[in-house]
Amino acid sequence: MRWKYAAWILIAVVDVMCCSSEEKSASVSFVTRPGSQVIAFPFIFVGHSIVVLPTTKYSNLKRNAKSMEDLTFLLSNLSHVVWSLTIDSTVYKDGGRLEKLFDKRMRGYLDGVSLDVLRMYVNGSKTFSELLQIVYERTFECDSRRSRQMARYGESLIREIDNMIESMPAEMSEEEKEKMRSDLNNNRKYVESFHDTEKWRQVVEAEKMVCNTCKEICLGLKEEELMGLLAEGSAKKYIKASAGESEVSSTVYPEYIVVDISLLLDAHREHGGDVTKELVKQMLLGKKEEEIDKRYIGKVANAVKERRRRGEKEIEKRVKKLLRDEEKAKSKKRGKRKSVGVSEAKEEEKKESETEEVEAGEEVEMPSEEVGGARRKTGKKSEGGRKRYKIHRRVLRWRKSPEKIKEEWDKGSEERWRGKSLEEIREQKVFHDIMGVLELLRSPDADRFFMDTGDYTKGGSERQRMVAIGVLESGGKRMLGVVEVGTFKDCPSGCPVVYHLMFRVTGIEGMGDVMRRGGGNLGEASDVEKIDEDKEYQDAGKFVYPKGVTFETVKETGSFQIVWGNPSNTSEVLRRLTIQCRPCVI
């Protein structure tokens, strides 16, 4: 095992652009095992936010002036970033002779590669995923018929290292000379691999596979599903763990993973694209190198196989149901009474329904509920009972009419709500009047939907914040975002009190700030400085909507829906909030 250091030159320059005129330097360190290599994901972050996806074209970037400013340096030096991630920096970043040799023999070549691919990106229609693959191909030149620049640079490095071994300073002690000799010999051995075209061909092949898979994932998922996938991994990023908060917040960087590339390539050849896609998803979710071995790959392959089997079975059931419905329609059209064939079909439908109920028992299900002045309790409590929450009056207030809400806010202590117009309150009621979320929050499997972003202290109270990815449909608009739940513990009972509940509209780009502990700037903007702990809480289990208000909660395999209907016309949907299930971690 050896330490490798990625020289993050992009950090220094972005700090100059965004922070001050004083240049700063930073580096990220990581450990690689024999056979392991750093592979870059085709995602670019600015601070905690994703600004470039595998599918992003240059024309997409031009719409966001700030992103263009932040990305200018990285895109102009993409080959340097790839080199820094891939090559052990101890062989070219010693602050002396080896670094000068890199400047003389390699820097100009990498500059040329970067400028060429940037020109290609600006003037063409390639995605960032395709661009990154081209950078790898041109940097390592594995298919070149000419002498590779990397190999020529390696020859110069070996000669320089040999000279350094032979001409050690006389004033050094024998112990110091021995250590220096050992380090230089290790570097020499590593540099010899620059001639190993097959090794670097594998690196390029693995990078291409990961880039193409990431692009497939982005194209194959709904935006909210992709947002959920990236949100889960946002707290597990390598660079976030290696660098400080202030350093990360002003940095442009690509995400990467350390992985055994031979293992990854073998898995792709043996199991195919579906298993590779799931493996890459798990890496994006935060699966680390030491967790990925042959046994784990087999586990992923079995999970993919089982998912495929269930999907095929579900399709088969739907086809049978369509055939039965078609047969019923024909029978009605002919005006016949129930025939033997229809009875048999009914019996078959009943049997299949019973089978479905048994199979559904494998997953946690929650019954639908309709609320219209009274709660209809159905289903059994899970072992240990449902989770208990209390509701703060500032959350309960949103169930009232806009006029009543305005009256109470104007008399209240929260300045940010005082003086709001009725129109503003009506707009905000759409995002805050989502009490049906408590049905999910209290359920035994709430953790399958909500992510805990951590505890933090504000206004003298310790608080917890949870978020879930969702889609809110209202007034003909479909809005992507997160459901935010803020709680604190009631004293002395210790029962969590929900004091903040809302749907926040945000896209993939702004998701990083939303996911930060304490909510980052976005969370702080909506958070209450000091909570009015007046004990006027209501037990969530006893909450009942006012008469005339109707909503239904529907729990499905991958989502939870709250549907608000028109009391005068139940077929008319006024609003629908769909909360996505968190992606499965294998």
UniProtKB/Swiss-Prot annotation:
Residue ranges under compositional bias (Acidic residues)? Answer: 354-368
Spell out the residue ranges making up region: Disordered: 326-386
The family database entries (InterPro entries) matched by this protein are listed as: DUF3654, UPF0329
Q: Which residues form a coiled coil?
A: none
Feature: compositional bias, Basic residues = 330-339
Q: Name one Pfam family in it.
A: DUF3654
Q: Where are the compositionally biased (Basic and acidic residues) regions?
A: 344-353
Describe the family membership recorded for this protein in Swiss-Prot or TrEMBL. Answer: Belongs to the UPF0329 family.
- Annotated protein name in UniProt: UPF0329 protein ECU04_1670
